Amino acid sequence: MNDLFSIEGKVALVTGGSRGIGLMIARGFVEAGAKTYISSRKADVCDAVAAELSKSGTCISLPADVGTEAGAKGLAEAIADGETRLDILVNNAGATWGAPLADYPDDAFDKVMNLNVKGIFHLTRFLTPLLAKAASDESPSRVINIGSIDGLQAPTMETYAYSASKAAVHHLTRVMAHQLAGQRIIVNAIAPGPFQSKMMAETIRTFGDNMRATNPLGRIGEPSDMAGTAIFLASKASAYITGVVIPVDGGISTRHG
């Protein structure tokens, strides 16, 4: 039981790992002893974050845009160039867009869906061979998709594509879990509530006090909340769990979900 929550020595990739939720997870993985690759579109930021995280362990920068099929394939090939296996894939890279229904841009809708949904599909597909090489009955490989509580309930803001994309991520997680179980690859999702991140920064600045007051646990999520959930889903402790969506939201989804 001593290694139940250990991911030491595992090889992980976290997309969108240079900021926000992805950075919380990547930092947790590095500090827990996993060799962690991070990707993001901005190479200079990705490189700088990897260098900072490497002070606590091993973190490698692989800049990429997984919002296109070619970008996802290129990232998978870059991982394969350096590794013979991949134990953990965290599909976190994502985008949002808010606009009134009558004015919602078609290209914005496509951008959000391409990155948030198709990006997960393509990257997981291209990395399945490496995930399968790491997998066994006793130690399945892991895919962790980052959804949102906005995919579980109707958001108050007019983020039509974002909430639709996250609902799609949750169901894609279940479909992939069913299809990949035979290769001993387990697939689960995390649905974050409010966390301090660049994507949420303006919302928290404007509505933070109200968000804390109305949250059943009375606060906004901390990095350790996200890192701990991801480490659980990446460790032996979750080896018999697949196809689930775990809200990490302080109880918001119990009230509205």
Model-based region annotation:
Residues 148:
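Residue(s) in the substrate-gating loop at a strand-loop-helix junction
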Residues 124, 165, 173:
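Active-site helix of classical SDR
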Residues 129, 178-179, 239:
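Alpha-helical segment proximal to the catalytic Tyr-Lys
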Residues 2-4, 153, 231, 242-257:
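Short C-terminal tail/terminal secondary-structure segment
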Residues 181, 186, 241-243:
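Short, small/polar-rich loop/turn modules that mediate ligand/substrate recognition or access, typified
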